[in-house]
């Protein structure tokens, strides 16, 4: 076993190799502080036939024992990955995926298992570091060293590896990953930071990444690694030459510039089919079928090259826009009659239907994960059905991509939400992607912002998002605004920025190339700001402020604060009182016994108000001389017991009765006055009458209102 240690940026990094998981192609145990992960990398012996991508899978396993916890719920064992585990897996996947050879077709699985956590150093950061080492010490073809760092902005200063307390005060919470040469991945949220602040954070993060990579280089120098030789399949020279000759550059250009995603896609498919059939006729169906994946790859390369040259040489994009142009935008609100808020945002051929649902405090998402416990009052769920891209696929649960896109949009919007004291509702946004041709996550931000205002949620301002792209060639560097799906696929960078008029609230970047300079990043950020401000104007033109009232179909929620020591009075023995209130007034009641906050929820404001009035009555301090209309609950030879308010019963002694005890019935209503409260809080009552002629002890009998009297 070999161990390496180094202090970097005030954190101790420790790496162990050769002790555990020796059957994997590569394995390390990496530790920062007390957060420890085991990262393994394994590659299959044979290639997967008939695919045109690198079959990489990254799994992030949370083990509750790492935090000294036992999983909650009925089954005391970890099940399917939590949302945070999926997001952490994506954080590791995105910076390492571009570093595999494009021709690799052997399955590769990277598994990062959290085996200890100190709740200070987040496991995803350690996971990127460990995965990079596991791949580099293995024989798996992998070209690069990566590392990641979390960045905060506290009191105007950039903080690397911020603690949980610092993040609570931080204006920025981003994860930055990269190689020694460039930043390759960014993901995070902000509280309206400026473009210059974001750029400084990225540059400071890259300096830290270089220090971590230097430590990785020291570790890797110990190994004499011989990478597996994966033969790259190529087309026979004769067929490749003929295929290139059959590709007419002008026709390819004309087909690429056909307007409309579907029409363009069909035209390009037809052109490939035409060339394919010519080759089939010349070389035979069997031979060409064997080479079909390679031919598709070659065609894809030609399309990528041609699209990029059109942009560079002609300054025109596939939909005839200039680099800074934004596609036509339309916005609508209030589309659906019964939902609490709705909006349709359409930008070119990308369309998101945003729906807001308002719920009670008990509708909050319960979180019981490795690092977090508690509840979450704002949720955004992103759905990407196959029809949005004109495809047929099985409908299953949400994909990792859907979870990741929803999380990004949620982070973009949460900063503008009102606090719970001002707006005590649980808020859920669902984004239905109805059509997609690039930047559907940023369309989700826009539809979500519109739908929140349509629902009457008092958000402070609109939030909009835009996706940027990059074409990086030797002769030019072109930043593209509001990218199409093809520009994302064949371009060099996907750069998403969301925010308000006053700053950035969410940020995501994936870069496929090295050599992205600070100047280029600054240019992209400033161009994104121009685009964001333009989109925001469209949102404000549609709905400029939240509606004054909530939907009539939204629940009514009213909150009162009581002395926490009196919570038991509302609950009652065995929950008797609160159950009666819920039943009698047709409401839901949520009580926080720590803060004394009581939320009353119902479909009818009058019933909610009546329930609150009754709660106030229950909590009212009872004094000698107070008069109540109470219900007889028990009769004894010495007197009767009368409930004057829920849970508060006093003794009405027979000597204090005006009425003959023999005529009193259980359930009837009596007017009583509090005559005494002893030192144990017990109530003594006397029957009360407005008439001065009625005296206690003078027995009289008369018909009085009783429960169920006819």
UniProtKB/Swiss-Prot annotation:
Protein name stated in the entry: Polyribonucleotide nucleotidyltransferase
Family annotation (Pfam families): KH_1, RNase_PH, RNase_PH_C, S1
Keyword vocabulary terms for this entry: Cytoplasm, Magnesium, Metal-binding, Nucleotidyltransferase, RNA-binding, Transferase
CDD domains associated with the record: KH-I_PNPase (cd02393), RNase_PH_PNPase_1 (cd11363), RNase_PH_PNPase_2 (cd11364)
Residue spans of biased composition, Basic residues class: 701-710
Basic and acidic residues: compositionally biased ranges: 691-700
Residue intervals of the KH domain: 555-615
One of the protein's GO biological processes: RNA processing
Domain of life: Bacteria
Domain (S1 motif): residue spans on this chain: 625-688
GO cellular component, one term: cytosol
GO molecular function: 3'-5'-RNA exonuclease activity; magnesium ion binding; polyribonucleotide nucleotidyltransferase activity; RNA binding
Signal peptide: none
Catalytic activity of the protein: RNA(n+1) + phosphate = RNA(n) + a ribonucleoside 5'-diphosphate
Role played: Involved in mRNA degradation. Catalyzes the phosphorolysis of single-stranded polyribonucleotides processively in the 3'- to 5'-direction.
Listed transmembrane segments: none
Cofactor: Mg(2+)
Gene: pnp
Cell compartments where the protein resides: Cytoplasm
Region spans: Disordered: 688-710
């Amino acid at each position: 076993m070999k161990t390496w240690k180094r202090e970097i940026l005030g954190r101790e990094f420790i790496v162990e190799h050769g002790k555990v998981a020796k059957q994997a192609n590569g394995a390390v145990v990496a530790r920062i502080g007390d957060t420890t992960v085991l990262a393994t990398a394994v590659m299959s012996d044979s290639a997967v036939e008939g695919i045109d991508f690198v079959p990489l899978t990254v799994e992030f396993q949370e083990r509750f024992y790492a935090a000294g916890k036992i999983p909650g719920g009925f089954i005391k064992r970890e099940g399917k990955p939590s949302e945070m585990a999926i997001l952490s897996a994506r954080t590791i996947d995105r910076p390492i995926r571009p570093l595999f050879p494009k021709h690799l077709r052997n399955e590769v699985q990277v598994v990062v298992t959290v085996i200890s956590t100190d709740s200070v150093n987040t496991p995803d950061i350690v996971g990127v570091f460990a995965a990079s080492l596991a791949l580099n010490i293995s024989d798996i073809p992998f070209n690069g060293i990566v590392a990641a760092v979390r960045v905060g902005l506290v009191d105007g200063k950039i903080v690397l590896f911020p603690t949980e307390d610092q993040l609570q005060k931080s204006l920025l919470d981003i994860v930055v990953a990269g190689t020694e040469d460039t930043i390759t991945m960014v993901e995070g949220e902000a509280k309206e930071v400026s473009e210059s602040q974001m750029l400084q954070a990225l540059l400071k993060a890259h300096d830290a990444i270089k220090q971590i990579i230097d430590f990785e280089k020291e570790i890797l120098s110990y190994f004499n690694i011989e990478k597996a030789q994966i033969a790259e399949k190529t087309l026979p020279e004769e067929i490749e030459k003929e295929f290139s000759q059959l590709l007419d550059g002008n026709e390819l250009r004309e087909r690429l510039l056909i307007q409309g995603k579907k029409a363009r896609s069909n035209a390009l498919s037809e052109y490939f089919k035409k060339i394919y059939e010519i080759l089939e006729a010349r070389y035979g169906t069997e031979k060409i079928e064997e080479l079909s994946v390679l031919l598709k790859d070659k065609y894809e390369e030609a399309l990528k090259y041609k699209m990029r040259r059109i942009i560079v040489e002609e300054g025109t994009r596939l939909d005839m826009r200039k680099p800074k142009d934004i596609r036509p935008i339309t916005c609508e609100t209030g589309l659906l009659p019964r939902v609490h808020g709705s909006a349709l945002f359409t930008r070119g051929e990308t369309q998101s239907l945003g729906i807001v649902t308002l719920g009670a405090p008990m509708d909050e998402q319960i979180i019981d994960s490795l690092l977090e416990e508690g509840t979450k009052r704002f949720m955004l769920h992103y759905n990407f059905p196959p029809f949005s891209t004109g495809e047929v696929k099985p409908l299953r649960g949400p994909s990792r991509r859907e979870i990741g896109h929803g999380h990004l949009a949620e982070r973009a919007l949460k900063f503008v939400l009102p606090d719970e004291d001002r707006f005590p509702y649980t808020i859920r946004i669902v984004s239905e992607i109805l059509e997609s041709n690039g930047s559907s996550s940023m369309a989700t931000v826009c539809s979500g912002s519109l739908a929140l205002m349509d629902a009457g949620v008092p958000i402070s301002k609109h939030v909009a998002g835009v996706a940027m792209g990059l074409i990086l060639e030797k002769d030019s560097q072109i930043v593209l605004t509001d990218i199409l799906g093809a520009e994302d696929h064949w371009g060099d960078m996907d750069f998403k920025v969301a925010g308000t008029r006053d700053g950035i609230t969410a940020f995501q970047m994936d870069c496929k190339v090295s050599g992205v300079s600070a100047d280029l990043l600054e240019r992209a950020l400033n161009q994104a700001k121009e685009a964001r401000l333009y989109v925001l104007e469209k949102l404000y033109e549609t709905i400029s402020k939240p509606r004054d009232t909530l939907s009539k179909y939204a629940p009514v929620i009213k909150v009162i604060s009581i002395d926490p020591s009196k919570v038991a009075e509302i609950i009652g023995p065995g929950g008797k009182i609160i159950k009666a209130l819920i039943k009698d007034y047709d409401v839901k009641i949520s009580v926080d016994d720590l803060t004394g906050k009581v939320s009353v929820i119902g479909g009818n404001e009058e019933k909610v108000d009546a329930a609150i009035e009754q709660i106030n009555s229950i909590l009212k301090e009872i004094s000698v001389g107070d008069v109540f209309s109470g219900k007889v609950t028990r009769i004894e030879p010495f007197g009767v017991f009368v409930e004057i308010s829920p849970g508060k019963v006093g003794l009405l002694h027979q000597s204090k009765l005006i009425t003959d005890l023999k005529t009193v019935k259980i359930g009837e209503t009596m007017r009583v006055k509090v005559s005494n409260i002893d030192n144990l809080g017990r109530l003594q009552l006397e029957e009360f009458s407005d008439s001065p002629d009625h005296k206690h002890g003078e027995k009289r009998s008369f018909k009085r209102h009783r429960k169920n009297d006819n």
